[in-house]
Curated annotation (Swiss-Prot):
Keyword terms: Cell inner membrane, Cell membrane, Membrane, NAD, Quinone, Translocase, Transmembrane, Transmembrane helix, Transport, Ubiquinone
Molecular functions (GO terms): NADH:ubiquinone reductase (non-electrogenic) activity; quinone binding
NCBIfam families registered for this protein in UniProt: PRK05715.1-2, PRK05715.1-3, PRK05715.1-5
Listed name of the protein: NADH-quinone oxidoreductase subunit K
Keyword rRNA-binding listed: no
Transmembrane segments: 5-25, 31-51, 62-82
Compartments, as annotated in UniProt: Cell inner membrane
Binding partners and assembly: NDH-1 is composed of 14 different subunits. Subunits NuoA, H, J, K, L, M, N constitute the membrane sector of the complex.
Gene3D superfamilies hit by this protein: 1.10.287.3510
Function: NDH-1 shuttles electrons from NADH, via FMN and iron-sulfur (Fe-S) centers, to quinones in the respiratory chain. The immediate electron acceptor for the enzyme in this species is believed to be ubiquinone. Couples the redox reaction to proton translocation (for every two electrons transferred, four hydrogen ions are translocated across the cytoplasmic membrane), and thus conserves the redox energy in a proton gradient.
């Protein structure tokens, strides 16, 4: 059995749906929210690589590196906010983010 473009797209759609489901299901825990966003970005990257490989163009694979760079910066900023929230309030609840003003 050979893997076709449809197999990769279905896997990307499943990962994307799990990520969106995680975002909507758990909006209070910041760690789960960040992991769900990263899962959505992983699904998008998988689709870029699948289309790039299928059509023989390397532009999609190069674009994935830019997305991974932005995702790493987003994760670093999100984790910095998480550490700040936990140090000040001893919680990682997203509802408490409005207390970090100042």
């Amino acid at each position: 059995m050979t893997l076709t473009l449809a197999h990769y797209l279905v896997l990307g759609a499943i990962l994307f749906a799990i990520g969106i489901f995680g975002i909507f299901l758990n909006r209070r825990n910041l760690i789960i929210l960040l992991m769900s966003i990263e899962l959505v970005l992983l699904a998008v990257n998988m689709n870029f690589v699948a289309f790039s490989s299928w059509f023989g163009d390397t532009a999609g694979q190069v674009f994935v590196f830019f997305i991974l760079t932005v995702a790493a910066a987003e994760a670093a900023i999100g984790l910095a906010i998480l550490v700040l929230l936990f140090r000040n309030l001893n919680t990682i609840n997203v509802d408490e983010l409005d207390r970090l003003k100042g």
